């Protein structure tokens, strides 16, 4: 049994075998409280005739197709790995699975707000947990472009690394309610652990920053509905813009991504996470009462660090 840990030797061998190009990830967040639908199309090159594996942690794998040929999940999926043999020079792998919502801050975390019963989701992938949401070569040096398509209840906001597109109306998977589907633009090549999905009835305030190269960068600050009266968005956005200006001047490099959202999320198991263009912060940084100066300073340090 291979287990769920990746060794350095395995990572080195896999990097020498495959080169990742792109992932198309389709997620259905309307299937209930325990699992969500995940379909991944991974495109990659490989040494012809070679073998490797792709990572996935899922309670159910429905189907696996490699270069048009079906593979039996019972034969090729073990622990957190899907074995891939007799690879071609150019490969397309399609994996359809049910993945599990988490309550430990790994993968796609699900939280129900006791204040109003609303449900919130956010991802935390650093370092080995994007495999809990989609099939992926889970190591930072195998970068690729990611295209996310997300179906969620119609009352939800959905955020990712690329700017949020206009959603298409649809129905929930069981046809019992209204939903909408977001098709996000492909990202630049990046490591899987800095990709992100945030979904739920988050409430936000938006602004803009003019980057050093003249681009207008959209900014957003979001939190759950029950905390919005406490969110000092003006101060957070002002600090963010001053931080951008300082770092662009210091490093003589403009901001690299197309937008910059900051989402303050519940039950976060760290201070924050620098997902590309979609940063998550623990919502303890939304102060419910007048904070001491040290807490304000700590939040500022975290925002500028990310």
Regions found by a protein language model. Give the residues of each.
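Acidic/His-enriched low-complexity segments
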Residues: 1-258, 284, 289, 301
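Catalytic zinc-binding patch centered on the HExxH motif and its immediate surroundings
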Residues: 74, 233, 264-282, 289
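Long, charged, glycine-rich C-terminal linkers/tails
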Residues: 256-266
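Short alpha-helix carrying the canonical HExxH Zn2+-binding catalytic motif
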Residues: 295-306
